[in-house]
Amino acid sequence: MIRFETMAELVKLAEEKAVPLSEIVIRSEAENTQQSRFAVLVAMEENWEVMKEAIQRGVTNRERSVSGLTGGDAAKLFIRQKEGGYLGSAALATAAYALGVSEVNAAMGRIVACPTAGSC
């Protein structure tokens, strides 16, 4: 059984087995979910695609949530980040991505809630 609770324990396991950290995490997930390694990788790929779609939708659409209280701000921020600014393009783009996913979530769009959508 693969068990770790801290980064130090994860690093130690990876060193003992001479594999990357990611491999330990994949093996742990396969074990915990009783799925094959391949099934875990397929699920990870599907989640990654949903994450990318939510980001893209969030920074390009100006749709409002059902309540009308949120929506469109991520697209504005994404446009602004191309101009640079005080925080720099990378930080503004990251903020736009996070805000975009939050807005997609508020508009009842599809996101990956990992580890929780509560932060949105």
Question: What is each stretch, according to the model?
Answer:
Residues M1-G109:
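Generic N-terminal targeting/processing segments that precede catalytic cores or assembly contacts
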Residues M108-C120:
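Conserved phosphate/anionic-ligand binding catalytic regions in large, soluble enzymes, centered on
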